[in-house]
Regions:
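Phosphate-group recognition and catalysis centered on beta-loop-alpha active-site segments
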Residues: 1-212
Length: 212
């Protein structure tokens, strides 16, 4: 199981999407998920909510990422439409290859696909049939209110050549231990350690649990 820290490896909520959280994640060799928005004439910034002048610039984030030279996976959550061209320039400038973009609107996603981005589609209780499935590199699997992910669903995606990233239940304020046990069993039975990721608020605990 590949571990992605949710908005970085933060110790308190104020550290989410901060340099400190990103630095801590990379030091511990965890990939991460973070949020991208536009900042008017200021380019792309890191921010889950509405952007402000205090937000970290994406270019500075990529500089930090490249400093570690570890090629860790980056899940780039697209929070605003129309970022494709600016994002592509930065990805090419910093030679970012182990990444995927996701969570944008469907019309916006099609533009990313046309520009050959690594795009993940979504699957959840509300999105039972993932959009643009054939063109997606992988699936972002989200359990908002209940546990529905099972071995057969994951096997179908893997057999179709897709990578899979599961949203850990604690991100939706649900207990995660039972689901983690099931994910671990699925991973073991299908032998898909290199194709399965989990996005979590507890990266250290996840690393110990899934990779013991």
């Amino acid at each position: 199981m590949k571990i992605l820290s949710h908005r970085g490896y933060w110790k308190n909520k104020q550290e989410k999407n901060s340099i400190a959280a990103f630095d801590r994640s990379f030091i511990n060799l965890y990939g991460l998920e973070t949020d991208l928005r536009d900042m008017g004439g200021g380019g792309i910034v890191i921010s889950h909510d509405m952007a402000s002048e205090n937000c970290l610039k994406l270019e500075d984030f990529f500089k930090l990422y490249k400093k570690y030279n570890a090629n860790l996976p980056l899940a780039l959550n697209i929070k605003a439409d129309g970022l494709q061209n600016s994002l592509k320039q930065l990805i090419e400038k910093y030679e970012i290859t182990n990444y995927f973009v996701f969570d944008m609107s469907v019309p916006d996603a099609l533009l990313y696909i046309d520009l050959n981005f690594n795009v993940f589609t979504r699957q959840s209780e509300y999105e039972k049939e993932p959009s643009f499935y054939d063109k997606a590199h992988g699936i972002w699997m989200d359990e908002f209110y209940s546990h529905w992910i099972d071995k057969n669903i994951i096997k179908k995606h893997i057999d179709n050549g897709k990578s899979v990233c599961i949203v850990s239940p604690e991100l939706h304020k649900r207990d995660f231990k039972k689901e983690w046990q099931e994910y671990k069993q699925i991973e073991k039975e299908l032998q898909i350690q290199d194709k399965l990721m989990i996005c979590t608020d507890y990266p250290d605990e996840a690393m110990r649990f899934f990779n013991d």
